[in-house]
A protein has these predicted regions:
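OB-fold/S1-family single-stranded nucleic acid-binding modules
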Residues: 99-126
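Bacterial N-terminal signal peptides that target proteins for export
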Residues: 1-8
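Short nucleic-acid-contacting surface segments enriched for D/E, G, S/T with interspersed K/R
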Residues: 78-96
Length: 128
């Protein structure tokens, strides 16, 4: 085998491993450990490869910020959910259901979110 062939094969394997690790959500989030939170949607990052939402909840007098990761914007667009739907909820109360991060941080994989107008958005390809 030539050095060029070995190099190409090694590069392909490295790329495949990186892509697999990035999309292996079960390694990052525990699908059996769910949390439901009600709080203020304080930030939204609506871009590829995954949207990110920050929900500020209260624990007594302490505010806890939760980082919730969701699918790509195109996932939501295909389900008739637009950036403007979520932007309208900024600085308002939302209820979110998420799978917790395995590392114990205040992070989760978004499953569903109820917007202030009562619209429920699902971040699951099928039933959550």
């Amino acid at each position: 085998m030539s050095q060029r062939t070995i190099f190409i094969a090694a590069a392909a394997l490295m790329f495949a491993a990186t892509a697999w690790a990035h999309h292996n959500m079960s390694a990052i989030y525990d699908f059996n450990d769910r949390i439901t939170m009600t709080g203020t949607l304080s930030k939204m990052d609506w871009r590829n490869p995954h949207i990110e939402l920050i929900v500020d909840t209260k624990n007594g007098t302490e505010v806890q910020s939760w980082a919730l990761e969701g699918p790509s914007p195109s996932f939501f667009r295909a389900r008739d959910i637009n950036r403007s739907d979520v932007e309208a909820a900024l600085n308002k109360t939302v209820t979110a259901d998420a799978s917790r991060a395995r590392d114990g941080s205040r992070a989760g994989l978004l499953r569903t979110m109820t917007l202030p107008d009562g619209k429920v958005i699902s971040a699951c390809p099928q039933n959550c």
